[in-house]
Amino acid sequence: MTTAHQDITQLGALDLSRAIHTMQVSCREVMLATLAQVDRLNPQSNAIVSRVDSDVLLAQADERDAQLARGESMGWLHGVPQAIKDLANVQGLRTSLGSPLMKDFVATEDGLMASRMKAAGAIAVSYTHLTLPTICSV
């Protein structure tokens, strides 16, 4: 089902959305490729600081595939994995805002950005690293 000779993780957002919606690639395949990429690169880059459990992510991807099979799409981000900066609440993820003081805070609900991305079909995979000086400079 994957696009021949093309690494899924190298597709841009629009091309990935198009491939998912035309069923050239499944949401599960996209998620598996994304998780493999994170597992391969994160030990060196330390970009991902909090991640949703793989089984939960694959179940969400399977649900997105089932929706497409029924002719339903949530929007152009349908099934597209998203890493969100550790600045916006994502329900169930540890949200530190880059501060050691917040290291144990777990969001009980999605913030505006995450809820809009999810409403458009995105699957929130993880938080990306954020340092406190980043927030202070905004």
Which ranges hold each PLM region?
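Secretory-pathway/luminal and periplasmic proteins that interact with or process carbohydrate-rich
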Residues: 39-45, 71, 89-95
